[in-house]
Amino acid sequence: MPSYTVTVATGSQWFAGTDDYIYLSLVGSAGCSEKHLLDKPFYNDFERGAVDSYDVTVDEELGEIQLVRIEKRKYWLNDDWYLKYITLKTPHGDYIEFPCYRWITGDVEVVLRDGRAKLARDDQIHILKQHRRKELETRQKQYRWMEWNPGFPLSIDAKCHKDLPRDIQFDSEKGVDFVLNYSKAMENLFINRFMHMFQSSWNDFADFEKIFVKISNTISERVMNHWQEDLMFGYQFLNGCNPVLIRRCTELPEKLPVTTEMVECSLERQLSLEQEVQQGNIFIVDFELLDGIDANKTDPCTLQFLAAPICLLYKNLANKIVPIAIQLNQIPGDENPIFLPSDAKYDWLLAKIWVRSSDFHVHQTITHLLRTHLVSEVFGIAMYRQLPAVHPIFKLLVAHVRFTIAINTKAREQLICECGLFDKANATGGGGHVQMVQRAMKDLTYASLCFPEAIKARGMESKEDIPYYFYRDDGLLVWEAIRTFTAEVVDIYYEGDQVVEEDPELQDFVNDVYVYGMRGRKSSGFPKSVKSREQLSEYLTVVIFTASAQHAAVNFGQYDWCSWIPNAPPTMRAPPPTAKGVVTIEQIVDTLPDRGRSCWHLGAVWALSQFQENELFLGMYPEEHFIEKPVKEAMARFRKNLEAIVSVIAERNKKKQLPYYYLSPDRIPNSVAI
């Protein structure tokens, strides 16, 4: 009788093993085997991290094996099991791989396809078509869209982490408990001793150093020492944790009535301000989005304030970007003066602090939350709903949505919900952050997620004109490496544009993103369908780049740039100044966050800047969803390209007092998971 050798690999994460009964049956083109209990006498089967082998003898020839059925039945208590893969050695000596990489929970039957990626058109056998359809029907019941707030991209229909499908939950929920992590952060940073003085002001700038430990020889220390300097202020718009707002100014806005006479002491080329604009030396950052946003009112004991500044910047003869004019609100007038570097020291400093605070709010809520977290969740939900596990695009993307839906669900549960942690320290808490996302949706376009196009749209593409924009330089390298990789994978499975156009599952995936993620907005520019291999490759590059590189660029620098409180105040306790010549150091300190909010803020940016335990970085694919040699070779080339980028960035950083490493591929996690 024919005999098969079955190898079963159990996951190595905590509680991956099981004591439940595991049965296996084989489905072939010529018949189906009986159920076989996988059990070895005097042996503990399916332990965490184990690879177990079993001989399975069948009564008759089964033909080509098409499916493997796994049944899990309760032994004593339900015991979840994480199955990595099954391999089958046939009586003819052939090896067949059946990837799984998911949790098997309860008393269930799981059906596995072999690991070869297949488009829908490749499945001509009824049982395979049926399996494909049933998998998507089941997933669409599990992964349901929900509107968390009006106007937001839709998210997963789950009130809390434990409501999620087991496959997308964190291995340990404790590791992503925001309350626990923030408390741990404050303990690690030795700042919980200040919490009893929650609403008291600091005495002066030096007083902030009491909560600033463990920073020797770090970017944080450099920020603390140089934050008041105009060069450091300008540098952050290029290479800080929000390097996406600065744009070349092609015309001075009417709402900022700045003149040459006002700024001539800052201009170094003996040109008028208008001539500097024409020569491309003037840049602008406009926080119009914040105009009219409600400030946090959740604490009746502390008034909090927001501004909507406009900041004009200048490229000096050293090609460095420096601020030359700041107006703290959108409508010009006598009580909304334009602050200048030539003003009194504390006037100018407070104006810059207001800009830094506004930048913090836009960074946290729009650049970070909306444009990486929420967008990546949309891609993840659409993928699970519309692409079966056998689809090549599912196999390509699944690593890049790992834990994303889970981290966002935890954020909605603890962080950005009503009365959540975000409300404790941020002026945009208490609902302002919701208003911001609703406003910013109109600017969330497909083109703005295409990295090269986004850089060009802001007039920031020239390396000769703007030589110190490392976010742009490194981002373009990583974008091109991802684009090359996705193009290779697409070409393996789609031999022509027509195959792309005629792939119904792919088109449903793209349409789901448009309809539910972008809420069917034509102005978003998101495609409803893809019609060519080139377009598909670009689309996949957007998905992967957003989840990996873009998130890394705007997330992991938060402690570096935001931990020195005066450089990134999460709230301001007095309104913007309405006149010049009245600001004192005491007024600035009383405007900055109090001790308690400073501590909450510091704990938050520390916790958010940490990599996950056992982090998987860009190009690492330990779960082998693909088994075909051409794709594995493409992955190897991808990793080689990424290693070359790591070397280029490391070599440049050797010469820099202020290194930029957020887009070094060895520091870019595969997915949004923190």
Curated annotation (Swiss-Prot):
Residues covered by the Lipoxygenase domain: 119-674
Cofactor note: Binds 1 Fe cation per subunit.
Positions of Ca(2+) 1 binding: 17, 79-80
Catalytic activity: (5Z,8Z,11Z,14Z)-eicosatetraenoate + O2 = leukotriene A4 + H2O; 18-HEPE + O2 = (5S)-hydroperoxy-18-hydroxy-(7E,9E,11Z,14Z,16E)-eicosapentaenoate; (18R)-hydroxy-(5Z,8Z,11Z,14Z,16E)-eicosapentaenoate + O2 = (5S)-hydroperoxy-(18R)-hydroxy-(6E,8Z,11Z,14Z,16E)-eicosapentaenoate; (18S)-hydroxy-(5Z,8Z,11Z,14Z,16E)-eicosapentaenoate + O2 = (5S)-hydroperoxy-(18S)-hydroxy-(6E,8Z,11Z,14Z,16E)-eicosapentaenoate
Gene3D superfamilies with a match to the protein in the record: 3.10.450.60, Lipoxygenase-1, Domain 5 (1.20.245.10), PLAT/LH2 domain (2.60.60.20)
UniProt-reported outcome of changing residue 14 to A: Impairs interaction with DICER1
Result of altering residue 400 to S/N: Still some substantial activity
Names of required cofactors: Fe cation
Subcellular location, principal: cytoplasm
UniProt-annotated binding residues for Ca(2+) 2: 18-19, 44-45, 47
Pathways per UniProt: Lipid metabolism; leukotriene A4 biosynthesis
MF terms in GO: arachidonate 12(S)-lipoxygenase activity; arachidonate 5-lipoxygenase activity; arachidonate 8(S)-lipoxygenase activity; hydrolase activity; iron ion binding; oxidoreductase activity; oxidoreductase activity, acting on single donors with incorporation of molecular oxygen
Enzyme class: oxidoreductase
Record's function text: Catalyzes the oxygenation of arachidonate ((5Z,8Z,11Z,14Z)-eicosatetraenoate) to 5-hydroperoxyeicosatetraenoate (5-HPETE) followed by the dehydration to 5,6- epoxyeicosatetraenoate (Leukotriene A4/LTA4), the first two steps in the biosynthesis of leukotrienes, which are potent mediators of inflammation. Also catalyzes the oxygenation of arachidonate into 8-hydroperoxyicosatetraenoate (8-HPETE) and 12-hydroperoxyicosatetraenoate (12-HPETE). Displays lipoxin synthase activity being able to convert (15S)-HETE into a conjugate tetraene.
Protein name as it appears in the record: Polyunsaturated fatty acid 5-lipoxygenase
Organism field: Homo sapiens (Human)
Organism phylogeny: Eukaryota, Metazoa, Chordata, Craniata, Vertebrata
